Curated annotation (Swiss-Prot):
Coiled coil: none annotated. Pfam families: Beta-prop_KIB1-4, F-box. Residues 19-69 form the F-box domain. It comes from the Eukaryota. InterPro entries: F-box-like_dom_sf, F-box_BR-signaling, F-box_dom, KIB1-4_b-propeller. It comes from Arabidopsis thaliana. This is Putative F-box protein At2g03610. Gene3D superfamilies: 1.20.1280.50.
Length: 216
């Protein structure tokens, strides 16, 4: 049975809890708390309030070295706490977000010495580049089709017109608009790094649709 003293203590405890303002914590107290957080929670903490953001910028974990200018990359993808960046020099950088702070993978990056380039013909330029991560973490025996902002993955051998596995298929809108090409559908062969133009279809880009039975 609660005594009058117990009720008084409970009221004081509730009053103290209601009066707590976590946004007004002393910076010297808040700073070590923020620095002890994981990488994800650490970056979430800066959105709590303006006071926390001010303290967050003074923490040791605040490091902008891994930040990438959006103008220096073609595309990015995120999977299993790792950020993959396809850079302007055709390399893939990998940043690991599983630790206390993002770290760039060096020796463990299998693509560090493997630039992804293609042989350009005169006046040929591919201006939309994408990076895709397969479920297995590698891209083998697969075909990627880009169009309408959708990427499809299918384990097929050959569907005709030069479209086969180990290739990337793209359509007219993925090319530099002024490029005079014999076809509006291109095939990029991953093994040879060459682009072929099977044939020109007499339709517009918004009329072309891809359909793969069993994968749609």
């Amino acid at each position: 049975m609660e005594t009058p003293n117990d009720l008084v203590k409970e009221e004081k405890r509730q009053g103290a809890s209601e009066n707590q303002d976590w946004s007004k914590l002393c910076p010297d107290l808040l700073r070590p708390i923020l620095e002890s957080l994981s990488s994800i929670d650490f970056h979430r903490a800066k959105t709590v309030c303006s006071d926390w953001y001010s303290v967050w910028k003074t923490c040791k974990g605040y490091d902008s070295k891994w930040n990438q200018n959006s103008g220096s990359i073609f595309d990015m993808a995120y999977k299993n706490s790792k950020l993959y960046l396809y850079t302007l020099d055709h390399h893939i950088k990998i940043y690991d977000f599983s630790g206390d702070s993002p770290k760039e993978e060096g020796l463990t990056n299998p693509y560090s010495n493997h630039p992804f380039r293609f042989d350009e013909k005169p006046q040929e330029y591919i201006w939309k580049r994408k990076i895709v991560i397969a479920e297995s973490g590698e891209m083998m025996n697969e075909m990627l089709i880009f169009g309408h902002g959708v990427t499809m993955r299918a384990q097929v051998h050959d569907v005709g017109d030069g479209i086969k596995r180990d290739s990337i298929c793209f359509v007219e809108d993925d090319l530099w608009p002024d490029f005079d090409r014999p076809s509006n559908c291109g095939i990029f062969n991953l093994a040879t790094s060459r682009i072929t133009w099977p044939k020109r279809y007499g339709v517009y880009i918004d009329q072309k649709q891809w359909f793969l039975p069993g994968f749609a």
